[in-house]
């Protein structure tokens, strides 16, 4: 999960989770994954924890910058960067086994 959570970081994660756009993006991802059942990336995105998935999805699929994501959720860019790094490592590890 997330390393070295501080109270501030935990509060920021709560902001990410409660944003309506978070639910909308998760629904979009599920729908898109259903339309493309053979796409490993979409399946693995769905397997990420909700906080990480909510940050990685707009970064990878929508092409948003980390600054734009941080601004959208009103959290620090460091929180977004941490979640993106966690997501990158998890996806890299999961997708490496499917070569």
Regions found by a protein language model. Name each.
Residues 56, 69-70, 80:
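Hydrophobic positions on the alpha-helical face of helix-turn-helix-like DNA-binding modules
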Residues 73-98:
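DNA-recognition helix of helix-turn-helix
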Residues 65-74:
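Short helix/strand-capping connector loops at secondary-structure junctions
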Residues 22-52:
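Amphipathic alpha-helical segment used for protein-protein interaction
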Residues 2-3, 7, 42, 57, ...:
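Short amphipathic alpha-helical interface segments enriched in basic and hydrophobic/aromatic residues
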Residues 47-64:
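Short amphipathic alpha helix immediately N-terminal
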Residues 1-30:
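Charged, low-cysteine interdomain linkers and short loop/connector segments
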């Amino acid at each position: 999960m997330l390393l070295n959570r501080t109270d501030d970081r935990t509060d920021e994660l709560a902001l990410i989770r409660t944003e309506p756009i978070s639910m909308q993006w998760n629904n979009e991802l599920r729908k898109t994954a259903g339309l493309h059942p053979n796409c490993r990336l979409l399946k693995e995105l769905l397997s990420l924890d909700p906080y990480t998935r909510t940050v990685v999805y707009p970064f990878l699929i929508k092409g948003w910058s980390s600054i734009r994501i941080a601004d959208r959720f009103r959290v620090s860019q460091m929180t977004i960067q941490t979640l993106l790094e966690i997501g990158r490592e998890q996806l890299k590890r999961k997708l490496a086994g499917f070569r």
